[in-house]
Amino acid sequence: MIERSGEAFEEGIQLTVVGGKLHPGQKAPDFHMETLPPGQGTPSSVSLSDTAGKVRLLNVINSIDTPVCQCETRRWEELVGEDVIVYTVSMDLPFALQRWLGQEKARHQALSSHKSEEFGQAYGVLLKEWRLLQRAVFVIDGEGVIRHAEYVADQMKEPDYQAAVHAIKSGSLR
């Protein structure tokens, strides 16, 4: 497995990222992760292919229990219209993710990859030292092609929201 150094850090401490980078124009790897639908006590499985034909935004975060990740997740609620499926992805337990989304009255789904590092490796966002995901944003069109990919190096910084919104509004996604 590819390991990348010098591409992620927090407060000057370098982190190793596992997996190769994905780029616009590439097919997005399918995934299977858990979500906890509101009002249900048992997690269910979600895959990227479940929403084929729709534009998807993957908001990949370290943990929903950190201020930067919370701010970022709230921001996507404000910026992205209902015609785009937003998934917040982390290695948090599905119960923690759903609790936070419920408190915030968020409309989008949270996906948990806590059982496996497969998503992190496939999307090139697994932080080896933390066993968490690197902050990143992916916009995937209805055909499953990546139209925007941003890997945020400084884990204390938010992504470039406008670049992702521009990719969504470019009209070439449907």
Where are these regions (language model features)?
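Chalcogenol-based redox active-site neighborhoods
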Residues: 1-174
